Amino acid sequence: MQYAIEHVSIRCRDIEVSIGYFQKMFGARVMLRRNLPNSKQIAYLQIGDTMLELMDFGPAAEPVDSREHYGVTHIGIKTDDFDAAYRDLKAKGADFLGEPFEPAPGIRLVFLREPNGAILELAMRDPKSFQAAIDQGTVNW
C-alpha cells in the first residue's frame, strides 16, 4: 500500500483573488469550481501533480484564530530551477518573507506569503545531497 498527498486546502478571504494568484504565480489550472450551500465557494486548482483546494465561506464566516490552530504551517512547492523560479516570482510581485537560503548542500529554500496569509515554501532539493545531509546530521533547520 502506498500513500501520497492528494490535495492541500486553503481557506480564502476572496476566492477570485486566490485563484488569480495561483494562476499568475505558479501556472495553476482550475480543474473544478462550484458554488455550494451557505455561500460557500470551492475551487480545485492543479499545480504539477498536486491539487490545491480553495474554500471561501463568504463574508459571514469567522476567521480561525491562528493562536488556536496547530495544523499546517506551510505548503512546499518544488522547482527544478530555483534561480529562475525565484526571479519569476519576484518579477510577479511575490511577498517574500526573507532571502533564499541553503540549509544544507543541494537544498535551496525561500518562503513567501500568499494573499490569504498562508506561507508557501519554494524548494529545490537534490535528493542525493539531501539524503547525505540527513545521514551526516548537517541539516541545520
Language model feature labels by segment:
Residues L122:
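Short glycine-/small-residue motifs
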Residues Y21-F22, F26, F96:
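Conserved hydrophobic/aromatic "anchor" residues
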